[in-house]
Amino acid sequence: MRIVLDAERCVGAGQCEATAPELFTQGDDGLGLVRDRPVTPELLGPAREAVDRCPVRAIRIESSVRTGWARGAG
């Protein structure tokens, strides 16, 4: 599993980092960034909560890895 954060939608509310600091941080521009680490079973709950708390729905959890570039990692 991996987390993808849509930088075009992110408004820098910080709910993702407040909810799951193990998975998210904020960049110099104030927008959310996904930390480069796997989403372990222990982190899946906080990841889902971050998805729910994002006010602009900029975060999603993908079960399969896609090719290409994204702001998220994992």
Curated annotation (Swiss-Prot):
Pfam families: Fer4_15 (PF13459)
Binding residue positions for [3Fe-4S] cluster: C10, C16, C54
Cofactor(s) named in the record: [3Fe-4S] cluster
Domain spans labelled 4Fe-4S ferredoxin-type: 1-29
Protein's pathway: Antibiotic biosynthesis; mycinamicin biosynthesis
Keywords in alphabetical order: 3Fe-4S, Antibiotic biosynthesis, Electron transport, Iron, Iron-sulfur, Metal-binding, Transport
Gene3D superfamilies: 3.30.70.20
UniProt cofactor note: Binds 1 [3Fe-4S] cluster.
Any single GO BP term: antibiotic biosynthetic process
One GO MF term attached to the UniProt entry: 3 iron, 4 sulfur cluster binding
PANTHER family in the record: FERREDOXIN
Function statement: Specific electron transport protein capable of effectively supporting cytochrome P450 MycCI activity in the biosynthesis of mycinamicin, a 16-membered macrolide antibiotic.
Protein name: Ferredoxin MycCII
Classification lineage: Bacteria, Bacillati, Actinomycetota, Actinomycetes, Micromonosporales
